[in-house]
Amino acid sequence: MFIELILGIGVGLVSTALAARLSDTSAAAFSLAHHVFAMLFILFRVVGAGVGVVVAQCLGGGRRDAADAVARAALGASTWMGLLTALPALLAAPALMQALNAPAQVLPLAAPFLQALAPAMVLDAWNASMSTVLRTHLRTREALAVVVAMHAVHLGGALLLMPSMGLQGYAL
């Protein structure tokens, strides 16, 4: 989990540099919206750690069926948690950015970018819980490989799309 966190921070830094190639305002908008996303990233990982404890207890107690049930429940809970965080980001992005004191020139870029990132919150919630389930089943390499591949594809797509689409190209 620590390696995933460091990788996520590194991708965030590279992504900020990509946004800065567009303009200073784009970099500021990216950083502000990404700050909200990063806060939820940590929240999803904390919940995922709790899921990992329960799954590990079930597996340690020889109750594979209970571990499977917890994993399915975690997927359902992650869906709801992702949706409940994505909806405010989608529907109230300008208000959230104003609450974070977004400057007037940054707000028109930051709010739509946060709205474009909103669906990714559901995916990140799933990623957090399912990576934890994989790790508790001693599939740490596979879990890390998925995260590395995901970040590589995302950065590759951002490199191609950001010059023509701006911050929206990163969100895709």
Protein language model annotation of sequence segments:
Residues 16, 52-53, 94, 128-131, ...:
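Interfacial helix-capping/hinge residues at the ends of transmembrane alpha-helices
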Residues 5-13, 86-90, 151:
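Recurrent gating helices in multi-pass secondary carriers
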Residues 48, 116-135, 143-154, 171-172:
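Short runs within selected transmembrane alpha-helices of multi-pass transporters and secretion channels
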Residues 1-53, 57, 117-124:
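Transmembrane helix-bundle signature of multi-pass secondary active exporters and lipid flippases
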Residues 1, 55-122, 153-172:
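Short alpha-helical transmembrane segments in multi-pass integral membrane proteins
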Residues 18-19, 96, 134, 161:
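Broad structural signal for hydrophobic residues in well-ordered alpha-helices, predominantly aliphatic
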Residues 13, 18, 22, 36, ...:
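Short alpha-helical scaffold segments that flank and stabilize functional sites
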Residues 29-87, 127-143:
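Small-residue-rich hydrophobic transmembrane alpha-helices
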